Amino acid sequence: MKGEKGFQRYYAFLSLFTMSMLGLVVATNIFQMYVFWELVGVSSYLLIGFYYTKKEAIAASKKAFIVTRFADLGFLIGILIYGYYAETFSFTPAASALVAAGTMIPLALGLMFVGGAGKSAMFPLHIWLPDAMEGPTPVSALIHAATMVVAGVYLVARMFPLFIDYAPHVLHLVAYVGAFTAFYAASVACVQSDIKRVLAFSTISQIGFMMVALGVCTSLNPHEGGLGYMAGMFHLFTHAMFKALLFLGAGSIIHAVHSNEMSAMGGLRKYMPVTHITFLIACLAIAGIPPFSGFFSKDEILTACFRFSPVMGWIMTVIAAMTAFYMFRLYYGIFWSDRKSAVSDEHAQDTEHAHH
C-alpha cells in the first residue's frame, strides 16, 4: 500500500471493518449479531471498492453488496421468526418455547443458514467472492481469508446447540451444500490463471470443508461425538493463518511483476527467495502435508466425514487431493516454470525488503 492514494481512507475503512467483525464475534444475542453482520457487509463494500476509479472495482463492490444483502434478507426473516416463537433473541432460549414452536424453529434456523451461506460464499451465492479480489491485497488477506467469509461458519457454530437439538436435518443440508461447494470451487481453481482468483476459489472450497465438518456433527449420528464441530472450528483458525500468508505472498508477487496472470510469472524463486519460502510453507499447509497445521485440521474433518458416511468421507478426500493439485500447480507456475517475462531485479528486491 506504500504510495497509494487514499491511505487514510484505507485505514478508516479497515478500522470500521475490524470493529464490526469484533462486534459480531462478541455479540451476546442474535439481533446484536445481525447489526454487526450488516456493518461488516458495509465495510466490505467500501474496501472492495477502494479503487473507485476502476470500473471493475466498483462493479465488484456492488455485486458483493447486493448478493450478500439478498442472503441477509433470509437471515433477517429467520431472526424475526426465531424471536417471535422463542420469545427472545438470546442464543440460549427456554426449551419449552422452542418445543411449542414445532417446525418454525427449523425453518428459522434454515433461513439463518441462507444468510451464512451468502456471507461465506456457498453455492449458489458464491458469485461475489472471486470478483471481490479487486480490493487491495491486504484486504483480501483479512476479509477474504481470515475473517469475513468465515462469518457464516461462525454463525452456524454459534447457533450449533439449537441446530443439533431442534434442526438436525438442517445440519445435513449444511453438509451437502458445503460438500458440493467445496468440490465445485476446487474444480474451478484447477483451471484459473489469475493468482488471486485461484486463492479466491480455494477459499470457497476450504469454507465448504468447514461447513461439512459442522454439518456431519448431528444427533442423528451417535458415533460422531462432537468431532465435526471441533474440526470445523480448528480448520477455521488454521485456514485463516495459511490463507492470509498466501494472499500476502500473492500481493508481494503482483507488486513485483505488475500482473495477476500466472503466464507473466515463472522462475521467481531466484528473485524473491523470502516470498518463495513463505508461499511454499502456506502451500504445504493448505495441501494438508504434515507437520503443517492444515494436516491436523483436515485429518479431523475427514475422520468426522467417514464416521458420518463413507461416501462423504471419500468425496472430501478427493477434494483434499484436488486442493493439493491446484496449489502446487500455482506454486510451480510462479516459482519454478520457465520464465516468460522480464521482472525488474530491483523491484523484486524492493518487494523482498518489505518483508523484513
Language model features: what each stretch is:
Residues M1-M33, V42-H356:
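Hydrophobic transmembrane alpha-helices and their helix-loop junctions in integral membrane proteins
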Residues E38:
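Short phosphate-coordinating micro-motif centered on Lys-Gly-acidic
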